Amino acid sequence: MEKLTDLNYTLSVITLMNNTLHTILEDPGMAYFPYIASVLIVLFTLHKASIPTMKIALKTSKCSYKVVKYCIVTIFNTLLTLAGYKEQITTKDEIEKQMDRVVKEMRRQLEMIDKLTTREIEQVELLKRIYDKLMVRSTGEIDMRKEINQKNVRTLEEWENGKNPYEPKEVTAAM
């Protein structure tokens, strides 16, 4: 535990690893050296961070199985992310949470569908009542001559001299 908090120890181990790798792989044409060094540094960091964390978690936690499972899943997910995979490992607890969320969303949507169906039924009933009221009334013949637009229209007998004043007359034009 003391070595985990000792920054100088951690930095000296990383420097030692880099120096060792440089001496092993002295070939300047080695293209994979940065990748190998990165992987080794990540593995070293995971080792140094996870073991003391798990020891503390196991001592302080009541349920050590869940802590171990969570730590292992987190480590594998980190390795998968570093490898470039988008998929992640999930535990049963996470799956149950997601299923609960999906079931909750489905219930909400079913309630909304039920409300919409009820509204549609009410609208159909309202339209039926309106249609029934319109069909019950009998429409008699309406005298279209007495409508607003037809009041000032005169018939041929009512015009003076019996001539239509709006009829076009012959017009001669001068050239």
Swiss-Prot record:
Origin superkingdom: Viruses
Localization, UniProt: Host rough endoplasmic reticulum membrane; Host membrane, Host caveola; Secreted
UniProt keyword Calcium present: yes
Glycan attachment positions: 8, 18
Cross-referenced Gene3D superfamilies: 1.20.5.430
Lumenal-facing ranges: 1-28
The protein's role, per its UniProt record: Plays an essential role in the virus replication cycle by acting as a viroporin. Creates a pore in the host endoplasmic reticulum and as a consequence releases Ca(2+) in the cytoplasm of infected cell. In turn, high levels of cytoplasmic calcium trigger membrane trafficking and transport of viral ER-associated proteins to viroplasms, sites of viral genome replication and immature particle assembly. The secreted form acts as an enterotoxin that causes phospholipase C-dependent elevation of the intracellular calcium concentration in host intestinal mucosa cells. Increased concentration of intracellular calcium disrupts the cytoskeleton and the tight junctions, raising the paracellular permeability. Potentiates chloride ion secretion through a calcium ion-dependent signaling pathway, inducing age-dependent diarrhea.
HAMAP family assigned to the protein according to its UniProt record, in alphabetical order: ROTA_NSP4
Protein name: Non-structural glycoprotein 4
Organism name: Rotavirus A (strain RVA/Human/Australia/RV-5/1981/G2P1B[4])
